[in-house]
């Protein structure tokens, strides 16, 4: 497993505004999209491409284009939806699937309640969008779900990660090189309720309001 923390002043600036409890939902949504686009740039460094010959106004040359099958972007409902626009802005030709996983607040375990994904993901690079890597249960369940359907590589894009969550994922996937986590920051710890500290609160509630 590889972990990449995006070290960039714009990432740090946008994350600081997201953390601020005074930031309203419209601003939070906009900054989430912007931050995800920055993280997506890092997350797609190893995206699969192949050579392609083209003709410019001057001559012919060889460039690259995305290799088939197309990448799959998988937002985890509901908070991951707030990251989708930022990801597809950079990767507009990707297919989009949806996975509904939520954390049981008593056991902190992930529960699957929705699935809108192809049964066969053979050869696919999958990009999981989940803003908060807290306990790690949701991400582990997502990774296992995608690999069971044949995914070739899974990259998770998270706004924040907790050390406990990273350890949980690492324990589950080991040293396999086909799992990558890209995040804006690794925070201090989880509190007794399983929330990231200092964190930014409940990302879903801050994106969409309390439901």
Swiss-Prot record:
Cofactors named for this entry: Mg(2+)
Family membership noted in the UniProt record: Belongs to the UPRTase family.
EC code: 2.4.2.9
Residues at which uracil binds: 196, 201-203
Domain of life: Bacteria
Catalytic reaction list: UMP + diphosphate = 5-phospho-alpha-D-ribose 1-diphosphate + uracil
Matches recorded under Pfam families: UPRTase (PF14681)
InterPro entries cross-referenced by the UniProt entry: PRibTrfase_dom, PRTase-like, Upp_B, UPRTase/APRTase, Ura_phspho_trans
Pathway: Pyrimidine metabolism; UMP biosynthesis via salvage pathway; UMP from uracil: step 1/1
Keywords, sorted A to Z: Allosteric enzyme, Glycosyltransferase, GTP-binding, Magnesium, Nucleotide-binding, Transferase
Binding site for 5-phospho-alpha-D-ribose 1-diphosphate: 78, 103, 130-138, 202
Notes on activation and inhibition: Allosterically activated by GTP.
Source species taxonomy: Bacteria, Bacillati, Actinomycetota, Actinomycetes, Micrococcales
Descriptive protein name: Uracil phosphoribosyltransferase
